Amino acid sequence: MLIGILQTGLAPEALQDANGDYPDMFQRLLDGHGFTFRTWKVVEGEFPASVHDADGWLITGSRHGVYEDHPWIPPLEEFIRQAFAEHVPMVGVCFGHQIIAQAMGGKVERYADGWAVGATDYDFDGEKITLNAWHRDQVTQVPPGAKVIATNDFCANAALLYDDRALTVQAHPEFRPEFVDGLMKTRGKGLVPEAVMAAASQRLAEPLQDRTMAGRIAAFFKEPRA
């Protein structure tokens, strides 16, 4: 099964030698599930010719906001709507979670209570899953037809399921602790409050359920579809 990665942001260059870029992180996360991958850098205006150029699509995270004025965001939203119409499955992570929601009629805003960074606990339909986070934007209005499948006190709409069309999560299952640590030392400086980063640093060694989330993503992609 070919998964097309729609890359909407670039990892900091200083961290790429040790961690790779975002597509590398997702390939590492989903290793062992039988997928092959191809990446399109939509952040640089590179788009697939058709929603059928892959068997499923994965939209990455980004430092950009989905509500910002970038020339590649409207065509990405149109691509998402076309994939929905053609029943091509999509997974969205962080920015990907938000852009799918926005494209399908939801609302995304900068959250008044600020940032979620590092190991964060989520309630996935009664199951506690801890994943790394890095965001201050949130889906504040769920699109029609989407079901909330994960939540916590900070992020009410932490994961959404759109029947068999899309699975989206606000957290970053692809982020390893050392990458979060690197982000705090690079992009976090002067942007994320020191108290938030200090609390995140205290949880860097905590076990994550990234493999659990990888299994959920893989199972979603592999669901039988008419």
Indicate residue ranges for each PLM-predicted region.
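N-terminal beta1-alpha1 cap of cysteine-dependent amidohydrolase-like domains
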Residues: 1-71, 75-78, 82-86, 194-226
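Short, glycine/charged-enriched secondary-structure capping and boundary segments
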Residues: 18-21, 52-54, 71-74, 105-108, ...
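Conserved beta-strand segments of alpha/beta enzyme cores
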Residues: 36-38, 107, 130, 147
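Conserved beta-strand termini and adjacent loop/short-helix elements that scaffold enzyme active sites
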Residues: 40-42, 111, 134, 151
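A short acidic, often aromatic-flanked loop/helix-cap motif at beta-alpha or helix-coil junctions
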Residues: 44-48, 116-119, 140, 156-157
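Cysteine-nucleophile active-site neighborhood
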Residues: 59-124, 130
